[in-house]
Amino acid sequence: MQKNPTDKAVYSRSGIELQSFYTDSDIPEEHRSRIASNPGEAPYHRGFHPSGYRSKPWRIFQLSGFGKPEDENERIKFLLKNGETGFIMEHDRNTGDHCYNVDHPEVVARREDVGLTGAVMQSIRDTAICTDGLPVDSTFGHAGGAVVQHAPFALAAYWTVAQQRGFNLAKLPGTGQSDFNLTYLGCVTKEQIPTQPGLRFNADIIEFCDRYLPYWVPVSIAGYNAADTGLTPDQELGVLFANAVEYLDEIQRRGNVDLVKAAKACGGVSFRASIEFIEEACKMRAARLMWSDLLRQRYGIVDPKVANLRIHCVTAGSKMTYQQPLNNMVRGTLMALGAVFGGVQSLGVSGYDEALSIPSEHAHQMSVRIQQILQEETGISNVTDPLGGSYYVETLTAQLAEKAWEFFEEIQTQGGYLAALDSGWLHMRATENQYKEFMDMENGDQKVIGVNCFPDDESPFEVDGFMGTDDAFDVATERLKDVLRTRHEKAATSALKRLETDCRSDTNIMPAMMEAMSAEVTLGEIGNVYREVFGNWDTPIQT
C-alpha cells in the first residue's frame, strides 16, 4: 500500500518527511534493540524511572516575578497555595541581565519598564524580602540568574540569605540556570561578558556547588531559549549537547571535579514543548537517548544516576497569540501533554496572556490547573512511556536523534559551540528558520487559528495585559540609596576588591561573591567590575 497517497509531502518541524502511516519495517534497525529496554534502563529514552509518574509526579514549576521583591514573594506564595510544587524567581531583566543598578543611565531612561519582567533585586536585602516566608529548605527553588553574568550574584544572594536564616547549604535543594542560549543567542544584551569568561563563571559555579551544595543543580542548559529563537527540535537537541560538551571539557581541563560528578551537575536541562506535541514527546525521548550515548561514547560514563537525563520543560511562549487569547489555554494544554508524554521531570505552562504581558494572577493559576488536571483527571500518570512501541513514535525518535547528531557535528566543524556563537553561525541558523516560519504563516502553509485563519472581527473575550506595579523603579531607587548609606562600607569595599582580584586571576569567583553578598555589595557594583576586567562580548548581531 502506498504510504503517501497524495502528491504533497508533509514535514515535521525538524524537516523530516512524514508518512501517512508507519509500520514495523520503518523503525531503523539500530533502534530495535532500544525498544526492548524498559523505562529507567539504558539508553533511557523510555523514561527516567520504571514507575514514572506513579512514584513521582512531575514538578509544577512556574516562572514568576514582577515589580518589587515583595510583589514577587506574594505571587510565589499564591502559586504554592494553588498547588505549585516548586518555584522560580525572576529578576528584573533591565537591571539583572546587564548587572546594572537602577541609577544606571540606561535604566533611568527606561524607568517605566523596570519591574515588568521580574522583581528588582540589587542587593541581598532585596533577595531576603523576596524569599521571606518561602520554604527554601524543603521546596525546590530556582534562584534566578538565567543570564550568565547575572547568575553568580543571583545564586550567591539566595545562598547567603539561606545561610543567614540557619539553613545548611549542604542540604539546600534547588537549581540555577546561567544559560548560554539565552545570554548569547536568544536575548543578547547590550553589555555582557564574552563567552570565555562566561564559560569560566559556569565552571566556577559547578565546582562551588560540588564542594558546598551537593543537592543544587548548578547550571541548566536551556534548549528552550534556542528553540524560541528559531532553532528546530533537532537543532535544539544538537545545540544543547554541544553546549554540554563545552562545560564537560572545561571541567575536565581544570581537573578540580570528578567528571562523573560534573556530568551529573550538567544533567539537569530544559527544553521547549511546542504545539507539534507528538514530535515534542519524541524529542524528549531522543534527548535521554543522546545524553546516554554522549556520556558513554565520549567520556566513558555509564553510571545510571548520571546517564539518565533530567528534563524540565516549558511550553512555547512564542506560540501563544494575542488574537483570541483564550485559545492559548488549549495550546498550553496540548504542549504540556507532549512534554508529559515525553516523560519530563518538571513543567511550566506559559500563561494564556503570554503574548500580551507577563502572567496575570488568573493566567498563572490556570497554568497550574492545566497541569493538575493532567495529573489528577486524565490517567496519564498510570503508565510509563505510554507512546512507547508506536511505529511512528519509535521511528521519529530515532530520526530526531540522528538529525540532532548531524547538527551537533556541524557545530563542531565551526570550532565548537562557543565559536559558533562568537561567529554568529548559530544566529544565522535561527534567523533562517524564523524567516521560513514567518513566510509559511504569511502564505498559509502554517495555520494559526485566530491569526491567519478563523479570525474574529470582534474579540468576544478581551484580555487586558497585566502591567504589574508602577512603583518598582521609585522603591528600588530608595532602597539602593538606603543600602549604600547604611551598609558597612569598609567591608563592602574590601569584598569588592577581593572580587576584582579573583576575576583577574584563575581563582574561583564564588567565595568572593558570597563575601560580597554578606557585605551588601550591589549588583551594579559587581557589573562594573565585570566590565572593567572582562570587557563586553563582541556580538555578531548587527542592529
Spans of features found by a protein language model:
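Catalytic alpha/beta active-site cores
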Residues: 1-280, 298, 305-312, 340, ...
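Flexible, glycine-rich loop/tail regions that form catalytic "lids" or insertion modules at the edges
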Residues: 2-6, 10-29, 37, 42-44, ...
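Short acidic (Asp/Glu) and glycine-rich catalytic loops that position anionic groups and cofactors
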Residues: 56, 106-109, 136-138, 182-183, ...
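Generic, well-ordered alpha-helical scaffold segments in large soluble proteins
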Residues: 66, 75-82, 124-134, 157-161, ...
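Electropositive phosphate-/nucleotide-binding environments in soluble metabolic enzymes
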Residues: 70-73, 121-124, 152, 196-199, ...
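Short beta-alpha connecting loops at secondary-structure transitions
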Residues: 112-116, 182-192, 228-230, 271-276, ...
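Phosphate/diphosphate-binding loops
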Residues: 122, 150, 162-164, 187-209, ...
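Flexible glycine/proline-rich, aromatic-decorated loop/lid segments
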Residues: 261-263, 301-314, 323-355, 359-384, ...
